[in-house]
């Protein structure tokens, strides 16, 4: 359990822990936090600015945070990586050259050994494995997703090819800017999140966003993104290849070899045909126009359970 406080626009999290001198005595991961601080301070005395650069670089590119709705790099993982590689630029170069399942082991706990044999597989599912320098049984980067790992590789390469201050500045998702850039086929939704703990709210927003993205696949989603001000506003956007679906679609039924199921399918659907060993029906599309499709989609019960309200919808 932990407590969240807000004081003069700052968010504080108060987490009770037990005092320990060895990680083996910890009851949970937060008990080890003071040991993390000791290790980081010992190994990064001349690297504070490099750590700040790494954290801001990741923040600006939406890669910072191990929360479930972000699945990025925690501050501690970035500190370990900077300490291990020696500078911000060396860290980026190392990231670019890393393969999936790369292991970073600053204390050489597993030198000459196979980490994938030594540790439980459940701890090694992330694309980058960072052995916690104060707890050799832990992968500090376990929360990292493949998507965020690959994104860091991309932006690191872009930055090193052409260093620019813009890489350290957060880009606001703006309807005006997106509309100016895309010109058409844009869906921009403004929502009010539910209240609660940050990680819970963020995860609900992510689920809402992924739900909409899945449903819009029919219109061929080209680009997408979302943002949240951690207060009362979240925005989702999708750029699509088309604004309208055909009035009639081919809906797949069971394979022809499933005779009973095919018979039931024919009984339920009037206009059927066979193709590639399967039966299909021709169904009328209820909402072929993008705008009507989106407005109907926003009425879905699943979406209403994930957000407090939809404030505005723009389809251009």
Regions found by a protein language model. Name each.
Residues 12-16, 81, 235-241:
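A short beta-strand motif that forms the metal-chelation/ATP-contact edge
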Residues 3-5, 189, 238-240:
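Short beta-strand element of the conserved SAM-dependent methyltransferase core
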Residues 45-229, 246:
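Conserved nucleotidyltransferase catalytic core and NTase-mimicking acidic/glycine-rich helix/loop elements
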Residues 227-316:
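Extended, charged low-complexity segments
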Residues 10-56:
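Conserved NTP-donor binding/palm subdomain of two-metal-ion nucleotidyltransferases/polymerases, i.e.
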């Amino acid at each position: 359990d932990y407590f969240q406080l807000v004081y003069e626009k700052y968010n504080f999290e108060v987490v009770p822990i037990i005092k320990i001198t060895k990680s083996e005595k910890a009851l949970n991961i937060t008990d080890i936090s003071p040991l993390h601080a000791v290790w980081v301070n010992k190994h990064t005395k001349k690297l504070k600015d490099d750590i700040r650069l790494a954290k801001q670089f990741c923040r600006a590119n939406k890669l910072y945070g191990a929360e479930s709705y972000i699945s990025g790099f925690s501050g501690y993982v970035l500190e370990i990586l900077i300490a291990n590689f020696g500078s911000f630029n060396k860290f980026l170069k190392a990231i670019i050259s890393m393969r999936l399942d790369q292991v970073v082991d600053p204390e050489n706990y597993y030198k000459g050994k196979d980490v994938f044999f030594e540790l439980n597989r459940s701890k090694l599912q992330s694309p980058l494995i960072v052995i916690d320098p104060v707890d050799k049984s832990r992968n500090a980067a376990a929360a990292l997703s493949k998507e965020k790992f690959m994104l860091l590789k991309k932006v690191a390469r872009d930055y090193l090819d052409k260093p620019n201050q813009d890489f350290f500045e957060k880009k606001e998702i703006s309807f005006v800017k997106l509309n100016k850039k895309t010109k058409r086929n844009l869906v921009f939704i403004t929502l009010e999140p539910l209240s609660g703990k940050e990680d819970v709210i963020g995860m609900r927003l992510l689920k809402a966003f992924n739900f909409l993205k899945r449903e819009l696949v029919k219109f061929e989603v080209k680009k997408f993104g979302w943002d949240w001000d951690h207060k009362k506003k979240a925005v989702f956007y999708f750029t699509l290849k088309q604004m309208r679906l055909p009035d009639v679609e081919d809906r797949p039924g069971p394979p022809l070899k499933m005779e009973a199921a095919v018979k039931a399918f024919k009984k339920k659907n009037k206009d059927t045909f066979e193709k590639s060993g399967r039966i299909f029906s021709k169904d009328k599309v209820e909402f072929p126009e993008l705008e009507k499709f989106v407005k109907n989609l926003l009425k879905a019960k699943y979406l209403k359970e994930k957000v407090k309200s939809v404030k505005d919808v723009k389809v251009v």
